[in-house]
Amino acid sequence: LQESEYTPRSGYLAAEDDFFSFMRVHLGDNYLKLAGVSLQHIRLVCFVSRDHYHKISSVKTATVATGLAGVIGNKGCSAISFSFYDSRFCFIGSHLAARIDRKRLEARNQNYRDILKGLAGGFSANGLSDVHHEFDYTFWLGDLNYRIDGISRDEIIAKAGQGDVATLLKHDQLNEQRGLENCFLEFYEPDITFGPTYRFNRGDRTWSEEKMREPAYCDRVLYKTLPMGVVRPLAYQPC
């Protein structure tokens, strides 16, 4: 979760505590909180089935700031890693550089590289951890901020209304940059079968006209495995 900045409910001193508690109550007693971590307002929390909680070990958390001068935490990631039996898992929740222009596109790619480098030090005391290949299963999610480029806002809205997802994905910056091997090497994404999710007005699913920004697939979930690892996505849908 990114941009999680709000006044916490009564009884909570910080939004982080409020959010983590809300998730615990929502999931119910069959799930236990394994770990939670925040980089300013970028939050990641991991819950585990009570039946499997005792099978988990080596829990670690880390954060990497990629905002202004590489130290401001409005952009970057929060991450959690652990072992489940003999398999190593890593979850990375990130918020990358915004805006559509090509300079900002390269900034997003650089954020990706900086996060990998930063997590190598964050998860390892000697800084020698190879996050890209250390974990059996890695899930990278959040507001990656890659945009739809090369067609106008009106065209994007028209294609979305027609259900022409294929055309929109041809102009998707993340797909383009992955194809050029500029970011998210060896990561996979489930098939996108829905229209852009950025940016709707809250509550009514109409396109926001604030700053007249182009609709895009900003929020994504990607995954990678080591050889012999298998991930079978059951669903990939917008909320």
Question: What are the roles of these predicted feature ranges?
Answer:
Residues L1, F89-C90, T138-W140:
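Hydrophobic beta-strand segments of well-ordered beta-sheets in folded domains
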Residues E3-E5, A98, I148:
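Feature marks short, surface-exposed loop/turn motifs that line or immediately flank catalytic pockets
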Residues A14, D18, F22-D29, F84, ...:
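Catalytic lobes of large eukaryotic enzymes
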